[in-house]
């Protein structure tokens, strides 16, 4: 039976308190979805662990006063708290999920990373090139999937896997 099959790495089954329905939560990316995530561990272009050797992602970064470098192309000195940064990130996620805004336009307007000029596009990368929490979230996402808040030394990210 398909429901008894093992979930892909990072995924767990949960019960929604509001609707009483089962949903799936990825503790690596903080993504949640109603549909059961599909595991694909035996197709071409993968490394030995059943994941692609490289992924391509875009992101929206919100820095805060505790970020490794609390400045950006948008603001010389960032003074917002980590909690305020998380509120901004959660607001952007809601706007994207509701269809009010698209990821790329929000990234180009509000990301504290210079990749904002490329609508958040970071290009393709392999393991070992990004900070570990960012890398783990990126590789756990499926193409077209968006993460929840991802915390790194740089700040708080929303990641969209594009390839």
Swiss-Prot record:
Disordered as annotated region, ranges: 33-54
Keyword Isomerase: yes
Lipid biosynthesis in keyword set: no
GO function terms (MF aspect): beta-catenin binding; cis-trans isomerase activity; cytoskeletal motor activity; GTPase activating protein binding; mitogen-activated protein kinase kinase binding; peptidyl-prolyl cis-trans isomerase activity; phosphoprotein binding; phosphoserine residue binding
Function: Peptidyl-prolyl cis/trans isomerase (PPIase) that binds to and isomerizes specific phosphorylated Ser/Thr-Pro (pSer/Thr-Pro) motifs. By inducing conformational changes in a subset of phosphorylated proteins, acts as a molecular switch in multiple cellular processes. Displays a preference for acidic residues located N-terminally to the proline bond to be isomerized. Regulates mitosis presumably by interacting with NIMA and attenuating its mitosis-promoting activity. Down-regulates kinase activity of BTK.
Family annotation (InterPro entries): PPIase_dom_sf, PPIase_Pin1, PPIase_PpiC, PPIase_PpiC_CS, WW_dom, WW_dom_sf
Keyword annotations from UniProtKB, A to Z: Acetylation, Cell cycle, Cytoplasm, Isomerase, Nucleus, Phosphoprotein, Rotamase
SUBUNIT field: Interacts with STIL. Interacts with KIF20B. Interacts with NEK6. Interacts (via WW domain) with PRKX. Interacts with BTK. Interacts (via PpiC domain) with DAPK1. Interacts with the phosphorylated form of RAF1. Interacts (via WW domain) with ATCAY; upon NGF stimulation. Interacts with PML (isoform PML-4). Interacts with BCL6. Interacts with FBXW7, disrupting FBXW7 dimerization and promoting FBXW7 autoubiquitination and degradation. Directly interacts with RBBP8/CtIP; this interaction depends upon RBBP8 phosphorylation.
One of the GO BP terms on file: negative regulation of protein catabolic process
Residues the record lists as Phosphoserine modifications: 43, 71, 108
GO CC term (a single one): nucleus
Post-translational modification summary for this protein: Phosphorylation at Ser-71 by DAPK1 results in inhibition of its catalytic activity, nuclear localization, and its ability to induce centrosome amplification, chromosome instability and cell transformation. Ser-71 is dephosphorylated upon IL33-stimulation of dendritic cells.
Top-rank taxon: Eukaryota
Record's subcellular location: Nucleus; Nucleus speckle; Cytoplasm
WW domain segment(s): 5-39
E.C. number: 5.2.1.8
Name of the protein in question: Peptidyl-prolyl cis-trans isomerase NIMA-interacting 1
